[in-house]
């Protein structure tokens, strides 16, 4: 009888701990939130990165109100602007 009560108590603790994980307001769910980006398509996007630095891309994005910009090799050296996170109320 004691073993049964101990077993049920253990199961109850495990089940309740799985359902009670807290999440943050800015990133609901689990894992790491990937950064939101807008990549400039076509020749304009590659032209901004053709100098070998991200300076032109960064200036392009900042002037247009984005949080920043970088050249990414996995998008064929395209300029990608970082979208600022939404403001929390």
Swiss-Prot record:
Q: Which UniProt keywords apply?
A: Antimicrobial, Disulfide bond, Fungicide, Plant defense, Secreted, Signal
* Top-level taxon in the UniProt lineage: Eukaryota
Instruction: Specify whether Translocase is a keyword of the entry.
Output: no
* Intracellular or extracellular location(s): Secreted
Q: What is this protein called?
A: Defensin-like protein 108
Residues in the signal sequence: 1-20
Q: Which gene encodes it?
A: LCR51
- Which cysteines pair up through disulfides? They are 39-81, 49-71, 57-79, 61-80
Coarse class of the primary localization is secreted
Tell whether Chloroplast is among the UniProt keywords.
no
Q: Which organism is it from?
A: Arabidopsis thaliana
Q: Which GO terms describe its cellular component?
A: extracellular region
List the GO biological process terms.
defense response to fungus; killing of cells of another organism
Which family does the UniProt entry place this protein in? Belongs to the DEFL family.
